[in-house]
């Protein structure tokens, strides 16, 4: 992000005195004939830079357009000062699943782009999981495990998300020596860059997991946790009463610090999506997990996902107020904060949005636009921020731009947000693009149920009765597909005007792709009906259309899809 001479055309400054109450603040004004951006913290400053690029220079840096040469972009000099104060202490980012569905093989270059994107969006609390395979290899080596034993425990890159959440072990491995060396170097780069830009990384803390054979190999009291999803062997759970408990926990933290440094926030999710709690004093277990974290890092807070049975009542009753940061993981679809506000613990309003790395358009625009503010009104002392917790990245970027602007906006600004977004996204005002996005925000991007992302019929195994592509998915459409086609028609009106705009190229491909995949959902039903009635003329015409759509996908699409 930059270009020759860009840094000389804009002035920036970190000025802590901008904030009177500890909240992050940025100001955009002018100085010596140049734009002047100040922030009360480094994160506030980078957010202000992102705000200026979007809403003054009309440059939208997005997943499909993460690098840009700004040397030829006009930087308007503000005539008045714009001041923005953030209602969110924390702006959290990522999900363990993201590390396997999207990030498993990212390079240093791709990570640098993402971290810059994070900084421009004001993210100050990212989950950092790259390098955990190295940490565990070192822990188990010191504990006396052989390399063969370690290979049976540490998962491969595409499955480390579920390994780190104690759902499985060893799956997708073993990892070669060069991989461990690569990941350690990459981890140090990622964490260094995050910290350099004012972020506090959330590191995986010790949540009592050990290899499933720990009782035999280490002579400790570790409870078998059975299987996850019927077929994956879960790691064991180390009993907090074991005489070596503190020794093992601190062995973990020592090796974690060697690879990833010390943190102020640690993520642990014991009994995630199951496991066995019989015979375990849960209050004691939660207290010892918290205590060992605090022993290692006295100011640390425990970040826990609100998912499945977590956080259990025993956890909420045991951990002191201020000790937890609860991620209300699916606030946009199945929120839990309304029930009791997590009994006074700090929590974040999170948008999960994406399941399984699916690439179709999907979202809940109205809940996103309104429900963070609703939570703030009901629990003003409990809501400490927002978070994006997608399982997969690089889809529907409009939702992420909105989410991370919410804490810097007033609720009433939401009614014109799409107009401002459209101008930022394409560099100038466009009635056609505004209308197109407005239609999408009321249809495909506004799912009325907790349903996951829609799966495309064309991705399923060939069948005349397609209901899903994957075991947990659905192909059922919840929106009016004619409205999505109408949005595409509107947006195509400006195809000549924006043909060289990378964000337009991406978006028009995305919307047209969605109209085509939507049509196949009903087309396969028509094909099945014609087959059942033995109407071969209709059957041939319909399947020819279906195959034609497949051909379009194979030949003509934007390389981001």
Predicted regions, residues:
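Catalytic and substrate-binding clefts that recognize carbohydrates or anionic sugar/phosphate headgroups
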Residues: 82-83, 106-109
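Contiguous, structured surface segment used for ligand recognition
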Residues: 1-88
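Ordered core of a single globular domain
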Residues: 501, 505-554
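Catalytic-core regions of glycoside hydrolase
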Residues: 60, 64-75, 83, 94-98, ...
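Acidic/histidine-rich, surface-exposed loop or edge segments in extracytoplasmic proteins
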Residues: 30-31, 95-99, 524-526
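Second-shell loop/turn segments in exported
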Residues: 34-39, 100-104, 177
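Active-site-adjacent substrate/metal-binding segments within catalytic domains
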Residues: 88-107, 118
